[in-house]
Amino acid sequence: MPELPEVETLKNSLKDKLIGLIIKNIELKRDNLRYNLSPLLTTEILNTNILNVRRRAKYLIIDFGNYYSLVIHLGMSGRFTVQPANYKIQKHDHVIFDLNNCEKLIFNDTRRFGMVYSFKTNFLEEKFFYNLGIEPLSDLLTLEYLKSKLITRTIAIKNLIMDNKIIVGVGNLYASESLHLARIHPHKLGRNLKDDEIENLIKSIREVLTKAITAGGTTLKNFVNGDSKPGYFTQQLRVYGREGQKCFNCSSTILKTKNSGRSTFYCKTCQYT
């Protein structure tokens, strides 16, 4: 599933292309993705300038001059790309936005877990995003904040940093990578972390996410940016997907465990409990 670095990469690839343009028409190739499209995707976003392209958590947001916003969630396999006027519609292209420069914005989603909404902009923070946690790359992620969230829960640290009500956008892959960099065992209870471990974890989360954004995100299967280019952070993965291979730090074997359908990768030597 695309996480914060992938959506940030998508935002960066689309921002300069879209600001100032106008959506002239919306074509739906099916009635629903995760939810029905017609009541959630309205015509208020037509014929008004695009003012901004931004990200909140794993949502891509396109703001319009009439105080409406288009909100996209890529789900498991979504792609949101700019295509030329002569583009031929593909099998899983579900929503087509015609732009006033004759290009097209295409939402493609093989597994159909993605979402495309339009709302009044002020509705987003008040109702839609109100229960989301803080952005991990912001100054709000501090020792005091994270410690206050850990101390009241008897949950493994990996699950805690993946909780979008605490920190947004740190999915399974980036949680595994961040914990390896911080040398913290993923199954260690969050409440048992010392202050220096929490500070090191915050630093590691930021470092991993920043490197992933610089590399254009991680493409394991479906992800591409707005120019249809894949991400290359895959080449920098230290533990994720490397079960049975040697740890780059100590040459111990990378282990894999599974919990609630999620795989966790770690080094038992570097990441002690």
UniProtKB/Swiss-Prot annotation:
GO terms for molecular function: 8-oxo-7,8-dihydroguanine DNA N-glycosylase activity; class I DNA-(apurinic or apyrimidinic site) endonuclease activity; damaged DNA binding; zinc ion binding. Keywords: DNA damage, DNA repair, DNA-binding, Glycosidase, Hydrolase, Lyase, Metal-binding, Multifunctional enzyme, Zinc, Zinc-finger. It catalyses: Hydrolysis of DNA containing ring-opened 7-methylguanine residues, releasing 2,6-diamino-4-hydroxy-5-(N-methyl)formamidopyrimidine; 2'-deoxyribonucleotide-(2'-deoxyribose 5'-phosphate)-2'-deoxyribonucleotide-DNA = a 3'-end 2'-deoxyribonucleotide-(2,3-dehydro-2,3-deoxyribose 5'-phosphate)-DNA + a 5'-end 5'-phospho-2'-deoxyribonucleoside-DNA + H(+). Its cofactor is Zn(2+). The keyword Zinc-finger applies. Its EC number is 3.2.2.23, 4.2.99.18. GO terms for biological process: base-excision repair. Coiled coil: none annotated. Binds 1 zinc ion per subunit. SMART domains: Fapy_DNA_glyco, H2TH. A zinc finger (FPG-type) spans 238-272. Pfam families: Fapy_DNA_glyco, H2TH, zf-FPG_IleRS. Belongs to the FPG family. Involved in base excision repair of DNA damaged by oxidation or by mutagenic agents. Acts as a DNA glycosylase that recognizes and removes damaged bases. Has a preference for oxidized purines, such as 7,8-dihydro-8-oxoguanine (8-oxoG). Has AP (apurinic/apyrimidinic) lyase activity and introduces nicks in the DNA strand. Cleaves the DNA backbone by beta-delta elimination to generate a single-strand break at the site of the removed base with both 3'- and 5'-phosphates. Monomer. PANTHER family: FORMAMIDOPYRIMIDINE-DNA GLYCOSYLASE (PTHR22993:SF9). This is Formamidopyrimidine-DNA glycosylase. It comes from Rickettsia canadensis (strain McKiel).
